[in-house]
C-alpha cells in the first residue's frame, strides 16, 4: 500500500503549516512507515493510506514519486 506522509523537515522546530511537506512511501502498515522514516529527523504530522481514485489523483501531480526506503 502507498502512504502519503505530511511532515516538517526539522523535528526540533515548532510545526508551521506553511512549511509542511509531503512524501509517498510504499509500506505494509503505518507502523512500517514510521519504522522506515525513523532514521530521518522528520516531525511526522499525519500518515494516511491512499488508493483508488485518491491515488489516481495524486499520481497526476508532477511531484508524485514513491520513495524507496
Swiss-Prot record:
Ranges annotated as spanning the membrane: none
Reaction equation(s) it catalyzes: RNA(n) + a ribonucleoside 5'-triphosphate = RNA(n+1) + diphosphate
GO cellular component, one term: DNA-directed RNA polymerase complex
Leader sequence segment: none
Pfam families: RpoY
An individual GO BP term: DNA-templated transcription
Annotated EC: 2.7.7.6
Gene3D superfamilies (UniProt xref): RNAP, epsilon subunit-like
GO molecular function, a single term: DNA binding
Keyword terms of this UniProt record: DNA-directed RNA polymerase, Nucleotidyltransferase, Transcription, Transferase
Cited NCBIfam families: PRK13667.1 (NF010188)
Protein task: A non-essential component of RNA polymerase (RNAP).
Assembly, per entry: RNAP is composed of a core of 2 alpha, a beta and a beta' subunit. The core is associated with a delta subunit, and at least one of epsilon or omega. When a sigma factor is associated with the core the holoenzyme is formed, which can initiate transcription.
Family affiliation: Belongs to the RNA polymerase subunit epsilon family.
Name this polypeptide is given: DNA-directed RNA polymerase subunit epsilon
Biological source species: Halalkalibacterium halodurans (strain ATCC BAA-125 / DSM 18197 / FERM 7344 / JCM 9153 / C-125)
Gene it is expressed from: rpoY
Amino acid at each position: 500500500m502507498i502512504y502519503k506522509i505530511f511532515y516538517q523537515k526539522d523535528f526540533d522546530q515548532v510545526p508551521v503549516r506553511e512549511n509542511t511537506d509531503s512524501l509517498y512511501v510504499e509500506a505494509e502498515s503505518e507502523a512500517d512507515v514510521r519504522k522506515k522514516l525513523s532514521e530521518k529527523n522528520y516531525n511526522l504530522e499525519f500518515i494516511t493510506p491512499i488508493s483508488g481514485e485518491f491515488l489516481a489523483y495524486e499520481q497526476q501531480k508532477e511531484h508524485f514519486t514513491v520513495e524507496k526506503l
